[in-house]
Every structure is written in C-alpha cells, then in structure tokens.
A protein has these predicted regions:
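Short C-terminal boundary/hinge segments that cap the last helix of small helical domains
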Residues: 67-79
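A short, Lys/Arg-rich alpha-helix, primarily the initiator
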Residues: 1-24
Length: 79
C-alpha cells in the first residue's frame, strides 16, 4: 500500500466491506440493522463512497465484529 492516496484507500475499504458482507450472505439492510441504523443509507452510501461518504473507524470495528473478520482485512488490496 505504498504511494496510495486517501481516496484510493477509501475505495479499497468500500470494496472490501461490500465483498465481506456479501460473502457472509448479508444485505445492506441486514448489516445496517445490526449496526443500529434504521435504514441502509449509511452502509449503501459508504460502500460506494457516494457524496464523499466513508466508513469511520468505529463503524469498521463494528462491521468486523458483525462479520467476524479481522479489522485489518478491510485494508487489504487485491493483487
């Protein structure tokens, strides 16, 4: 992850959240509800980085616990 811009890092995180969520068979609504939100807007917007929306560290920690994956998994780039 050398020479990566903040925007590129956000894209990596967004793609990984969506990938791991889908792998666990959860919809955006399922994940949103388990995170304590009443709608999908936070998850759906952050998964596509819509209007500069991103997951914060607290949200990523909660998602990693819900999906039962390592926190650092969100930051891994595919080769």
């Amino acid at each position: 992850m050398h020479n990566i811009t903040p925007e590129q890092l956000y894209q990596v995180i967004c793609k990984n959240v969506a990938k791991y969520r889908k792998a666990k068979g959860l919809s955006q609504l399922d994940l949103s509800l388990q995170m304590g939100y009443k709608s999908v807007s936070v998850v759906s917007g952050a998964e596509i980085c819509y209007s500069n929306k991103h997951f914060n560290l607290e949200q990523l920690l909660k998602i990693s616990q819900i999906l039962n994956i390592e926190f650092c998994s969100f930051f891994k780039q595919e080769a």
